[in-house]
UniProtKB/Swiss-Prot annotation:
Gene3D superfamilies: Phosphorylase Kinase, domain 1, Transferase(Phosphotransferase) domain 1. Residues 435-452, 819-834 have a biased composition (Polar residues). InterPro entries: Atg1-like, ATG1-like_MIT2, Atg1-like_tMIT, Kinase-like_dom_sf, Prot_kinase_dom, Protein_kinase_ATP_BS, Ser/Thr_kinase_AS. Serine/threonine protein kinase involved in the cytoplasm to vacuole transport (Cvt) and found to be essential in autophagy, where it is required for the formation of autophagosomes. Involved in the clearance of protein aggregates which cannot be efficiently cleared by the proteasome. Required for selective autophagic degradation of the nucleus (nucleophagy) as well as for mitophagy which contributes to regulate mitochondrial quantity and quality by eliminating the mitochondria to a basal level to fulfill cellular energy requirements and preventing excess ROS production. One of its GO terms (cellular component) is phagophore assembly site membrane. Disruption phenotype: Leads to sensitivity to nitrogen starvation and H(2)O(2) and impairs autophagy. Shows high intracellular ROS levels. Also shows higher mortality from phagocytosis by macrophages upon infecting mouse peritoneal macrophages. Finally, leads to significantly decreased colony forming units (CFUs) in two mouse models of disseminated candidiasis and intra-abdominal candidiasis. Its EC number is 2.7.11.1. It comes from Candida glabrata (strain ATCC 2001 / BCRC 20586 / JCM 3761 / NBRC 0622 / NRRL Y-65 / CBS 138) (Yeast). This is Serine/threonine-protein kinase ATG1. Homodimer. Forms a ternary complex with ATG13 and ATG17. GO terms for molecular function: ATP binding; protein serine kinase activity; protein serine/threonine kinase activity. Its main location: cytoplasm. Belongs to the protein kinase superfamily. Ser/Thr protein kinase family. APG1/unc-51/ULK1 subfamily. One of its GO terms (biological process) is protein transport.
Length: 942
């Protein structure tokens, strides 16, 4: 990019050296002194879309302004403009500590200065990435010096890790050891100087105070934070222990596929730290590491004891006896060249004949291995920390592209075969993993760091709600259902008066859970017993794609292709507490359908305060109502998601379950084919009309007065998005969405999907909060199988929504950051850039989305009812409409004391309905309820 100036021309900003989701870091220099190098962190205000991001940046600025220390990256200047924040900071040309550990061998060969440093202080072994003792003790003392200063200011950093420990060039503003120490530095004067960076998570925390915010990087996070307990400044000491261990051994002391597993692994270690046999670590360092990595913070070494440790206070002057004229010369050369550490690697590789193409250049480990547990990477993370070495600028290198279809097929195959092979494609993980905690375990035996969990990439805000949801679901999954005779008998897994699912006695033989013969239940809600036994796929309800994507695709993706298959396979869940009945896809099919049909639970009190005294039946009743609401919103979000991210053909070919799903979408399901041609035509018409109508968001129904032009718009949509089942056109349908949509349409659909997913998350989180209050007030810690199944379903949907929301957020950023005119436009639908911008800027209202969708579904259900066909589909459609309209009337349902993060996200969508709107919606609810009642009376006669 071209150079530019900031602070009225005081600083010249040069080449980009790092980039993240929220910030870009450039190198530069003082205008009047080109040899005075700086780093400039630029944060666009448009990227700080919520107050948490802005707050973290302001905290970082405030803290850096107050602290000045030689081993802390200093804030030189700061400028706020109407569009950006510019933080002028110390320039650290040698990147961060991860370069020395994970790229040591390449640096030995390619970097002139570091080559000399490593020759003087050679690594202890070629079998691991551990550093020479001189590095270890020097950086330990420098880190201790910085922490001691922070403690004097009552500051806790909360994100100590190698990526936040930057390395500055030595021998630049001094020439000898004496001057080095006079300037306030500690350690060895001829080694790169360590500086703590990134105070986005730091807080002023007096020694007597406790904090409870979850933040930091999982692999370096103290167990009390992982377990979302209150913590104090000693959490930083745990992180120091992990960094010290990694400097000695080349790998973190604990690795896991997700935060919960990491906590369990730390707890199971019982304070016994295992050092690899190939690493020779002196006893003093081992003792210090073990004292730092103590599980109980009360028993963990204190700051005073740490600062007075014999290694921390060791005299290192014996490392400084030799003159280092060569080191000084190369340091001066590096300073004059103003080159960043990664550029030397690229340069040397190109000189050796390696292709200079971006997709074959040097890729740091942090880019090679995407995060495994993306479900917990919340958008509130302060990703301004492209800390001059964590993320290298895209013009310096670019990741090698991987065929997503091949990786997706590999993911399906690995799941079916029970493979332990780790898959590392971030986008496929987002697209296909509905429970991101279900990731294969890491290979701990590899000491080179190549198989380390990429949880150490950048830094992560641990989504506290996700941790709580998964932890509670694990607790209930391991509950001894068999001992609760009365609960099981009382519930008898009767899914809302559903006699076709039963538990065979004795109760300890839960693995025999299976379907009973088909029966019909009496009363006004009578219907055929099961969707499977009706010879009709649940995915026939395409108005919201509700039961096709949500149950047909998501459930089979999570649980396997059938209940029988699940019986013969081991659960792929990370949690060892899962039992097969809880992961039975058929139970989830029936559970969700019946929850929607059980419209008697539509209206619940606005504030729920449950406890064990109210009994398990009350809890189940509340959860069923909330689950139904979450599911209908989730289902509509899935429609939006499918328009942007169609499934790759390789995924469908690799999975029998998804092949079945594809036949459903192609209207060639052999089960449906058994029905009459007339019934099939009705279903096809319902599917084509409704799904095609939702694809083009520019032509949605906007108000009642716009319905006169409905047929014209619908015709346009059908012309553009043909869903006919003829020949090859049908087979290509699933891949036609995103390639046909304009960028403005993709942005609009993404925003709508995010709002819907966030609403589903809000309801699901509230469900788990209610369950948590009841569960932890229980003395017996026993629950019914019915409640257990509900909780596991809520957990699965919560994790899936979290993954997809994060993916859509990144997709949205990608399109919003694209320059106008870079995307091809359809000749049939070219519109001006101004029109595009107006369309994108249109505000998304959850209530309107649900209102319009509910009316669409009920309208087509009424048409089907008039034809006297598919009454079971009509029943499900009417019930879905009622749930959607009810949700649109709610203002943060089931609220409790304290504001939830999802409530905060959706607060702009609350209170958008005036009294007249609510009256209209109430009339529709009354009308549709009457239709549903009449329909059920009609069905009861059959």
């Amino acid at each position: 990019m071209d150079r530019f100036r900031i602070q009225d021309g005081k600083y010249v900003v040069e080449k980009e050296i790092g980039k993240g989701s929220f910030a870009t870091v450039y190198r530069g220099h003082v205008t009047t002194d080109p040899k005075s190098h700086i780093a400039v962190k630029a944060v666009a205000r448009s990227k700080l879309k919520n107050k948490k991001l802005l707050e973290n940046l302001e905290i970082e600025i405030a803290i850096l302004k107050k602290i000045k220390h030689p081993h802390i990256v200093g804030l030189i200047d700061c400028e706020r403009t109407t569009t950006d924040f510019y933080l002028v900071m110390d320039y650290c040309a040698l990147g961060d500590l991860t370069f020395l550990i994970k790229k040591r061998k390449e640096l030995e060969n390619n970097h002139p200065l570091l080559q000399t440093v490593f020759n003087k202080y050679p690594p202890p072994s070629k079998e691991h990435n551990g550093l020479n003792r001189a590095f270890v003790v020097c950086y330990l003392q420098q880190l201790a010096s910085a922490l001691k200063f922070l403690r004097s200011k009552n500051l806790v950093h909360r994100d100590i890790k190698p990526q936040n420990l930057l390395l500055a060039t030595p021998l630049t503003n001094y020439r000898d050891s004496k001057t080095f120490h006079e300037l306030g530095y500690v350690g060895i004067y001829n080694l790169p100087i360590l500086k703590i960076a990134d105070f986005g998570f730091a807080r002023f925390l007096p020694s007597t105070s406790l904090a409870e915010t979850l933040c930091g990087s999982p692999l370096y996070m103290a167990p009390e934070i992982l377990n979302y307990q209150k913590y104090n400044a000693k959490a930083d000491l745990w992180s120091v222990g992990t960094v010290l261990f990694e400097m000695c051994c080349g790998v973190p002391p604990f690795t896991a596929s997700n935060h919960l597993e990491l906590f369990k692994k730390i707890k199971r270690a019982h304070d016994e730290i295992n050092f690899p046999e190939v690493c020779e670590v002196e006893d003093g360092l081992k003792e210090l590491i073990c004292s730092l990595l103590t599980f109980d913070p009360a028993k963990r070494i204190g700051f005073e004891e740490f600062f007075n440790n014999k290694i921390v206070t060791e005299d290192l002057s014996h490392y400084e006896v030799d003159e280092n004229t060569e080191l000084e010369s190369k340091s001066k050369d590096l300073q004059e060249s103003n080159m960043f550490v990664s550029e030397f690697l690229i340069k040397k590789r190109n000189q050796k004949g390696v292709s200079s193409r971006k997709d074959t250049e040097f890729i740091p480990k942090s880019k090679q291995e995407p995060m495994l547990d993306q479900a917990y990477k919340d958008e509130t993370e302060m990703e301004t920390g492209v800390k001059y070495g964590v993320n290298i600028a895209p013009e310096v290198y670019q990741n090698e592209m991987i065929d997503p279809e091949k990786l997706a097929a590999k993911l399906i195959a690995a799941k079916q075969l029970g493979s332990d092979e780790k898959l590392t494609n971030k986008n496929i993980s987002h697209l296909l993993s509905s429970n991101s905690s279900r990731v294969n375990k890491l290979d701990k035996s590899n000491l080179s760091g190549k198989s380390d969990s990429s949880l150490d990439r950048d830094y992560v805000v641990v989504e506290k709600k996700a941790v709580e949801v998964n932890s509670l679901a694990d607790d209930l999954a391991q509950a001894n259902v068999g001992n609760n005779d009365e609960a099981v008998k009382d519930q008898n897994i009767k899914t809302l008066e559903q006699p076709h699912i039963q538990v065979h006695q004795p109760h300890n033989d839960i693995q025999n859970l299976q379907r009973a013969p088909s029966t019909t239940s009496g009363g006004t809600s009578s219907r055929r017993a099961s969707l499977v036994e009706r010879r009709l796929s649940i995915s026939s309800l395409n108005p919201s794609n509700a039961l096709s994507r949500a149950l047909g695709l998501a459930s089979t993706r999570i649980f396997g292709s059938s209940a029988q298959t699940n019986k013969n396979q081991t659960s792929n869940s990370t949690s060892p507490n899962y039992t097969q009945p809880l992961l039975n896809s058929q139970i989830f099919y029936d559970l969700t359908e019946n929850l929607i049909l059980h419209t008697e639970t539509l209206n619940q009190p606005a504030l729920i305060n449950v406890d064990h005294a109210k009994g398990i039946n009350e809890v189940i009743r509340i959860l069923e109502s909330l689950s139904a609401k979450a599911f209908v919103v989730y289902s509509y979000a899935e429609v939006k998601y499918a328009q942007i991210i169609p499934l790759p053909q390789a995924v469908i070919r690799a999975s029998p379950a998804l092949q079945f799903e594809k036949r459903l979408s192609d209207d060639s399901n052999p089960v449906i084919d058994e029905d009459s041609d007339e019934e099939l035509d009705v279903q096809k018409n319902l599917s084509n009309t409704l799904l095609s109508e939702t694809v083009n968001t520019r032509y949605r129904l906007r108000n009642d007065s716009s319905r006169n032009s409905y047929n014209k718009r619908n015709s346009f949509n059908k012309e553009r998005f043909s869903f006919s089942s003829q020949g090859s056109n049908n087979s290509k349908r699933t891949n036609s969405y995103s390639s046909t949509l304009l960028p403005a349409e993709i942005i609009s659909i993404s925003k709508e999907a995010i709002v819907l997913y966030m609403k589903a998350l809000q309801i699901l989180a509230q469900s788990m909060k209610i369950t948590s209050k009841w569960w932890y007030s229980c003395q017996e810690k026993i629950c019914s199988l019915r409640l257990n199944i509900l909780v596991q379903w809520i957990r699965e949907k919560f994790n899936e929504c979290l993954d997809k929301t994060d993916f859509l957020r990144m997709k949205l950023e990608e399109y919003e950051n694209s320059k106008p005119g870079t995307h091809n436009q359809s000749p049939k639908s070219k519109i001006s850039n101004d029109s595009n911008e107006d369309n994108v800027a249109e505000k998304v209202y959850l209530e309107k989305l649900l209102y319009d969708r509910a009316l669409e579904i009920s309208k087509y259900a009424a048409n089907l009812e008039l034809q006297g066909q598919n009454l079971h589909i009509c029943e499900l459609a009417y019930a879905t409409s009622l749930w959607m309209l009810t949700i649109s009337l709610e203002n943060s349902p089931y609220t409790d004391q304290g504001e939830d993060e999802y409530d905060e996200f959706l607060k702009d969508t609350n209170d958008v309905l005036d009294s007249e709107d609510k009256i209209i919606i109430g009339k529709y609810i009354k009308s549709i309820s009457h239709r549903l009642k009449m329909l059920r009376q009609k069905m009861a006669k059959y």
